[in-house]
Amino acid sequence: MEPIPNDLILEIFSRLPAKSVIGFRTLSKHWASMLRSPVFTELFLTRSSNRPRLLFAAERNGLLCFPDLWLSKDASPVICNPTTGMYESLPDLMRYKNARGFLGFDPIGKQFKVLSEAYPFSDQREHHEILTLGTEELSWRSNIISCPAYDRSLSEGICINGVLYYLAQTLGVPSCVIICFDVRSEEFKYFDAGCFNDQLDDTSGLILVNYEGKLSGINWKYGQAGERRTVELRMWVLEDAEKHEWVKYVYTLPENEVLDSCDFSVAGVTTRGDIVLCMKYTCKPFYVFYFNPERNTLQSVEIQDFGANLEAVENCGRVYAFVNHVEDLRVNKGKQLKSSISQVKHLCSCCNKVSQPDYHYQKA
Amino acid sequence: MSSKMIVLMSSDGQSFEVEEAVAIQSQTIAHMVEDDCVADGIPLANVESKILVKVIEYCKKYHVDEANPISEEDLNKWDEKFMDLEQSTIFELILAANYLNIKSLFDLTCQTVADMIKGKTPEEIRSTFNIENDFTPEEEEAVRKENQWAFE
């Protein structure tokens, strides 16, 4: 039989899980360099983007655990790529107590940047600091273009098409606005998001998502339908980006025994438009729920094997789910993270996010 | 209404009559049909009859229309049975799907092989793909250590 030519072997390898690909670097010198090449990592990313997955991290006793990595929560932020096990410690930054960090991606310059709140708004110091990942020396710098002053940030950020969005509360009469940070130009803009005002008391359940290309906010609350307690998903979609018009949609979820009796949160939206809900704490059995607004279907999926460690009742940990996780082999210069507990490092305590590029949301 | 038939000829001299609509799932064949050089049949010098039979079986199944109204879910189940083949046959199918430029078959065969090899040791992979190990034991150990995480 004719031997398989190298380019076809590459095609086969591009469909492997990242762990296998990294392991195959020991095949030979030729393959070690082929598997590290930009051509292959791009090919791998294309394949991986066609099968986005849910990535889970469980937090317990101050350690954040991805399937193979353990990180501890501390003051010093870290960016890590759970696919490759590489991490980068970010240089220390003086921040005020509730300062948030956001991760954004510039699709044109192909760069990741971290935007961090630093000081409360004042004339003496810049409110934000920016750090570009992938450069030789990581350092924080002040943004050149000022951000309009606001009282506090209210949500995690989401990066869509190279713009980082997050919800903030205005100074003076409290009202919601969306802060937009263009990752490439580092310019700030903002627009009204008064539709979220009635949640100013508690925005913890609200997340910003990319719903079919549009910025949206989702949260849930209990409702009532006759005798039955229902679960309602509320979604505000920025239908008109020019005029900044939001449209609100309310969905009453179909009855589901498991969902109706557990603690859950909204994890995000998949590229296919399914809203993903995830149980809050590890337990056995652990479920994730997919709600499709167009078809009004609710599907529960059992996730097995968080490991007996996390599943034991006394050990339950808070679960974070990342939707649209795509394996990415491109590696910033960084040290190898050892996966044993004895070598704990730190996770960015402000956003708990990992370096998975949000721009994958665009790939339909 | 009779559908247009074309003749495909394998490398070992066997002829197969196939509906044109089914055959043009192969981009290679589709181009030849466009260029109108199919009158005497299409010689496929790189595809043995044993493999061509499987390719034709695949294309017939994937030619979905009123006569063959199959669902995506059923196709996926069919794929699994179809790919229950010896590894060497699957490799030949990869080569054929590549040569004939049938994207979905190429994806299916490559993914099947990827799934078969993902748990294998580097030694087994070298043997499967005829890769010569040009690392010294020390060099190989160094690469392993560098990527320790992938071996746990």
UniProtKB/Swiss-Prot annotation, chain B:
It is found in: Nucleus. Expressed in young seedlings, roots, leaves, floral stems, inflorescences, and siliques, with a slightly higher level in inflorescence than in other tissues. GO terms for biological process: auxin-activated signaling pathway; jasmonic acid mediated signaling pathway; protein ubiquitination; response to auxin; response to jasmonic acid; ubiquitin-dependent protein catabolic process. Keywords: Nucleus, Ubl conjugation pathway. Disulfide bonds: none annotated. InterPro entries: SKP1 (IPR016897), SKP1-like (IPR001232), SKP1-like_dim_sf (IPR036296), SKP1/BTB/POZ_sf (IPR011333), Skp1_comp_dimer (IPR016072), Skp1_comp_POZ (IPR016073). GO terms for cellular component: nucleus; SCF ubiquitin ligase complex. Pathway: Protein modification; protein ubiquitination. The keyword Nucleus applies. Residues 94-152 are annotated as: Interaction with the F-box domain of F-box proteins. It holds the Pfam family Skp1_POZ. Belongs to the SKP1 family. Involved in ubiquitination and subsequent proteasomal degradation of target proteins. Together with CUL1, RBX1 and a F-box protein, it forms a SCF E3 ubiquitin ligase complex. The functional specificity of this complex depends on the type of F-box protein. In the SCF complex, it serves as an adapter that links the F-box protein to CUL1. Plays a role during early flowers reproductive development. Part of a SCF (SKP1-cullin-F-box) protein ligase complex. Interacts with ADO3/FKF1, COI1/FBL2, EBF1/FBL6, PP2B10, At3g61590 and At5g49610. This is SKP1-like protein 12. The lineage of its organism: Eukaryota, Viridiplantae, Streptophyta, Embryophyta, Tracheophyta.
